[in-house]
Amino acid sequence: MAHTLLLLETAYHRIGERIRALSDDLDILAMDGAGAFRLNGAPHKAAIDPTLAWMGLDLYRCPQAAKFSAAVTDAANLAWVQTALAGVEAPIYRGLLKRGVRLCSSDAQAPSIADFIVGCVLGHFQQYARRLALQADKVWQPVDFRELSSNHWLIIGYA
């Protein structure tokens, strides 16, 4: 069975050669930033019904993200989605899972989430909000803080 992979054109430009090397029996349906579709490089105006979709990080910077997401949710023959998100609790994924669509995610975002958490912990321990308020008021005043070296943390992730 031939498959049609839906992805953003920006992603295709990055990894298209590797995708093409996977199979000769794979049609590529790429959406550009204006929301236009190209099937195997040619403009495509007909209805789309991909069997596979790749929702990479580019999607969350795309001005046509809603159109792409609608194409995914409206695809009657969709069988598999790869997402860049950590969790699958987003409403779009709940509906796909109920339809039996296979959903895969990766841990590619884990380092940036870890950086964010460490930044939040430092902000809390160093009282960044208090420091910024004093700075905005042009007040110099020492701010007490806790050192991290004597602390133990337990971080629980749900994604």
Language-model features, listed with the residues they occupy:
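N-terminal glycine-/charge-rich "phosphate-binding" loop or analogous flexible N-terminal tail
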Residues: M1-L59
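Active-site-adjacent beta-strand anchor residues
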Residues: L5-E9, Q82, I155-I156
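Short gly/ser/thr-rich secondary-structure transition/capping motifs
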Residues: M31-R38, Y60-A65, L134-Q141
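A short, aliphatic-rich alpha-helical micro-motif
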Residues: P43-I48, V72-A75, L148
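Short secondary-structure boundary/capping segments
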Residues: H44-K45, Y93-G95, D144-R146
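Phosphate/diphosphate ligand-binding glycine-rich loop within oxidoreductases
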Residues: T51-L132
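Glycine-rich NAD(P)-binding loop of Rossmann-like domains
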Residues: R131-A159
